[in-house]
Amino acid sequence: MLARRLAALLFLLAFALLASQLPAATPATTPPAVQAVEAIGITVGDMDRAVDFYSRVLFFETVSDVEIAGDEAERLQGVFGLRMRVVRMRLGDELIELTEYLTPRGRPVPPDSRSNDRWFQHIAIIVSDMDQAYLWLRRHKVRHLSPGPQRLPDWNPNAGGIQAFYFADPDGHPLEILQFPPDKGDSRWQQPGDRVFLGIDHTAIVVGDTGASLGFYRDALGMKVVGESENWGPEQERLNNVFGARLRITTLRAEAGPAIELLEYLTPRDGRPAPADVRANDLVHWQTLLTVREAPAAARAFMGSRFTFVSPGVVTVADARLGFREGFLIRDPDGHGLQLRAR
């Protein structure tokens, strides 16, 4: 009996010694929830007018045009009794998805909206020639949100030489045209060609606390921080049309698609929070469309968190015209909408 115990003890000691010599197991890397920023969704009040503007003024091309109703769409968007027309449009490699709610009609963009209000979101359209692009927009009588194009100063190493201008679409949604200098931006924006309006570099959203937003976009969604900057001065103030504007800017990217840019106004701090009762049919509602591998797994990452689900959970979509099989709508810490979709 004693001999057997000694043998067992020697075996355990030998096994422990062998295990200590083996390399530590490397934990499996969890893939990011988000594969791509697929498109930027915008709720519009009049689809025919919006399509005319984006195609005739900004050179987007229509990809699809469908009308949707029924229980699945209602649960997905959190709007009962809806009928919506959804139009996808492309500029370069990037997509926008315009949605008009034929019923129920939503509220307009507040006429006193400012660039530091936390419902602010825009798309940054890259242009090859700012002077030509601005002249074209003037010819089409777009509504200015900046007094004119601004060139950010060279003392700022992360933004110096960038030219940008804010304006509005017919519903009052903010838009930006932007031209990178040769040493900044993706190399594809510097390729020679005869087009002026090239594509969408990013969508920008105003946030109240960059740290809280990184907990959502970086930590929960798995997007990567690819750029940071702090911008201030008269050029930045006039671009945003906010006196005393000083911004902390953080850029995140998924594996594919446009970036998401977080804009935190360090000063002034008087930007208003998004109304708590915003619904998807209100014209201040944007929804950034994110492609995920598995919608249920992505949804579980948010269960029990302080992030707000608009959909009651993952919604299975039988209508193939929408281009995905399941998804859900959620709001980030500042109320910006994101729809996570699995194909």
Positions of the model-derived regions?
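N-terminal secretory signal peptides that target proteins for export/translocation
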Residues: 1-4
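Short, structured motif recognition centered on aromatic/hydrophobic residues
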Residues: 37, 41-44, 60, 87-89, ...
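Post-signal peptide N-terminal segment of secreted/secretory-pathway proteins
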Residues: 76-82, 86-89, 93-96, 100, ...
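Vicinal oxygen chelate
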Residues: 24-32, 125, 131-198, 205, ...
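Core segments of cupin and vicinal oxygen chelate
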Residues: 43-94, 132, 139, 155-159, ...
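Bacterial N-terminal signal peptides
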Residues: 7-20
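Extended intrinsically disordered, low-complexity coil regions enriched in Ser, Thr, Gly, Ala
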Residues: 48, 52-68, 103-104, 111-119, ...
